[in-house]
Amino acid sequence: MKPLSSPLQQYWQTIVERLPEPLAEESLSAQAKSVLTFSDFVQDSISAHPEWLTELESQPPQADEWQHYVAWLQEALINVSDEAGLMRELRLFRRRIMVRIAWAQTLALVTEESILQQLSYLAETLIVAARDWLYDACCREWGTPCNAQGEAQPLLILGMGKLGGGELNFSSDIDLIFAWPEHGCTQGGRWELDNAQFFTRMGQRLIKVLDQPTQDGFVYRVDMRLRPFGESGPLVLSFAALEDYYQEQGRDWERYAMVKARIMGDSEGVYANELRAMLRPFVFRRYIDFSVIQSLRNMKGMIAREVRRRGLTDNIKLGAGGIREIEFIVQVFQLIRGGREPSLQSRSLLPTLSVIAALHLLSENDAEQLRVAYLFLRRLENLLQSINDEQTQTLPSDELNRARLAWAMDFADWPQLTGALTAHMTNVRRVFNELIGDDESETQEESLSEQWRELWQDALQEDDTTPVLAHLSEDDRKQVLTLIADFRKELDKRTIGPRGRQVLDHLMPHLLSDVCAREDAAVTLLRITALLAGIVTRTTYLELLSEFPAALKHLISLCAASPMIASQLARYPLLLDELLDPNTLYQPTATDAYRDELRQYLLRVPEDDEEQQLEALRQFKQAQLLRIAAADIAGTLPVMKVSDHLTWLAEAMIDAVVQQAWVQMVARYGKPNHLNEREGRGFAVVGYGKLGGWELGYSSDLDLIFLHDCPMDAMTDGEREIDGRQFYLRLAQRIMHLFSTRTSSGILYEVDARLRPSGAAGMLVTSTEAFADYQKNEAWTWEHQALVRARVVYGDPQLTAHFDAVRREIMTLPREGKTLQTEVREMREKMRAHLGNKHRDRFDIKADEGGITDIEFITQYLVLRYAHEKPKLTRWSDNVRILELLAQNDIMEEQEAMALTRAYTTLRDELHHLALQELPGHVPEDCFTAERELVRASWQKWLVEE
């Protein structure tokens, strides 16, 4: 055994002073001293359980001892009689065995392959034991789940990722999917439960037993987000539901994940074989599947963006040449050829890599380099995590942990270790890059004239610029030269580093040649240099623009078209990744797919990391906003569709924010107990104004009110019990907080909740009964006008139906026409006096006479005036469809309705484009005169004349 290095010997002296009496220094072997010095986790564990050290010394860890885990655990559980006892014994067993594995790993008593096998089989043993104990307990409590033939139905558990592949790392989440074979009901219990209910409840208890922290720690962090439909899907699915999902909706990333899926426990039973046979055609296609190449390219891009997003420069898993790239290389061949080559259908990486070499899909040299690199990286990863039983793949920055790793990896010092690490990761990155090329072969770098380089290097006199800037006016030419000079002066103030300078010197001649070819070169260059000034110290973004000419061209065209987009990219350079793929850049997400896209995006972020969750929500919104704006600029989205996309995006955000707030509140207080006998959350979010009317703009805030149907006597069922209505108040406050918290990516949305009953003086969240009573007995006419543009944007079906009924009832109340006309007109006049344009030579598109607000007031007045006679007028909340309804119900002539619709969409379109130009919403007085006259005439007809 290698002696401890000098820094570790010094550290050992500090440990001796802390050791409990049973671990006196003179009684410890050299092996024990080495392991205790290396791992704080082992040190803490053995200090708490000195008998474990005796066991380690008398029965040292063996490579094949995983075969005894089941028997050892059964013995530990033999006297367990309740769930608390089960949780305690599982946690102690896991800790005891992990200490043995850490001991064997630190001292290199067994191979790294054996360590991975032991870690994986330990997890499987604990999962299966917990499942089987709980299954028996649940059957005693609720009866045995059976199919139509009366045959007992088991819970099958798919272990995904490294758990499925038998390659679990030392401190790891476990990704699981739960399934049961056939529908049916329980038999033999006090009451009958549907199988879905039985397995859902059992699954929830299983997750709690494994995942919930106690004074003994936890067993494993359980991640269920890889199941069909993710967080929004059922916790447990029948075989039939699984098959339907993967046949009809399974995506390439799910094929990628399913390659390693393994059934935990009895993997050779009838049901296990049935499940495996059902999934195989989805994962492994019968033909050689080169169609997967594009998906794999996309995944490669996702890896690169993840590395940039999180700054993972020292990450041995996700960084360039890291563990994930080796896994990716192997799975490329499995996904492409696995259907035709059964030998490639292994879940484990190293055996599959051997098959790949045997089939000559990789050279023997490349395969061997990958094998050696993989074992090196996995040992380094497991050692790193075993120091403190911590889930990390980032190399340490402190001297102690660096000394620990260098010693355990058998290197003299840290520089020697990092040198070997760099060599391995370089080999991996080379194979990775060779395997997955770009869509098109790289074109040769366009030869730039020496003058463009000299222009950037400030080596040209003004007279020398004529050839390259000949098409520009003299003023523009001078402005371009000034901008370049100012940008270079700005760079001199920054700490860029030699690599950044090199990339910038390569990028700028390309950029200048493209920008200066434009007639609007000066204004475009102004916007782009402002953007570049914000990212010059972040070389990865400069490299992105330098290495992907298409991304640079998109950047130039978008910045030229819209200062708003230029500002967004400057504030949030992470959005530059969106420029890589024009197929998504100019093609916004389908309106009904935002929720699913957001769910997939959030899968990358730890569920319990609120800061990263907030950041991810904002980054997703900004990326989607960029796509919508790009499509708007390109002319592929008309104004109505722009608002549709912005509205659907906002609704997806509301859905995710409510979900996060709900999970956080329930974790703290439990659920209100009136929900125990029903589905849903008893909560709704109502959108007013532009959100309610499907008319959001690029910078619109959200007008929201919150409703609940919680009885007065309801309480929460958690350890910290609170009043049910107090729970919903805190939920609404939490939602407001999640929307408004400012992170490095800004806020999510400005939220205005003042349209709630009694405005800012009222409760933030209102019961459905109180809302209905307020609308009937206290609300002003303007509040009923606002209700015309209101709809539920998140909520249980029963609350949605209740709100719709209240809205319909209020809007269909009989109203005296003259009184209503006066109240609506006077409210509009007050608004115009307060909000109207103060510049006599300008027209405020929204607030001035003949503008958008006049059209909105006309439609609201007519709905409130005539809905009593024509209830169908209450159906929609947006102005365009309300105008259609007014024509269809003979309130307004069709010609007038169509003319108002055209005026409305024309003015809205102009507002969108002004927003893209970061200009205020007013135009010269002589603009839109025809539309304004039309609106004035309609206003006069409906709201002035008797």
Curated annotation (Swiss-Prot):
EC numbers on record: 2.7.7.89, 2.7.7.42
GO biological process: regulation of glutamine family amino acid metabolic process
One GO MF term attached to the UniProt entry: ATP binding
Catalyses which reaction(s): [glutamine synthetase]-O(4)-(5'-adenylyl)-L-tyrosine + phosphate = [glutamine synthetase]-L-tyrosine + ADP; [glutamine synthetase]-L-tyrosine + ATP = [glutamine synthetase]-O(4)-(5'-adenylyl)-L-tyrosine + diphosphate
Statement: the UniProt record of this protein carries the keyword Transferase: yes
Cofactor(s) this protein requires: Mg(2+)
Keyword set, alphabetical order: ATP-binding, Magnesium, Multifunctional enzyme, Nucleotide-binding, Nucleotidyltransferase, Transferase
Domain of life of the organism encoding this protein: Bacteria
Zinc as UniProt keyword: no
Sequence segments annotated as region (Adenylyl transferase): 449-946
InterPro entries hit by this protein: GlnE, GlnE_rpt_dom, NT_sf, PII_UdlTrfase/GS_AdlTrfase
Cellular-component GO terms for this entry: cytosol
Transmembrane segments: none
Region (Adenylyl removase): 1-440
Family affiliation: Belongs to the GlnE family.
Function: Involved in the regulation of glutamine synthetase GlnA, a key enzyme in the process to assimilate ammonia. When cellular nitrogen levels are high, the C-terminal adenylyl transferase (AT) inactivates GlnA by covalent transfer of an adenylyl group from ATP to specific tyrosine residue of GlnA, thus reducing its activity. Conversely, when nitrogen levels are low, the N-terminal adenylyl removase (AR) activates GlnA by removing the adenylyl group by phosphorolysis, increasing its activity.
NCBIfam families: PRK11072.1
Protein name, entry field: Bifunctional glutamine synthetase adenylyltransferase/adenylyl-removing enzyme
UniProt gene name: glnE
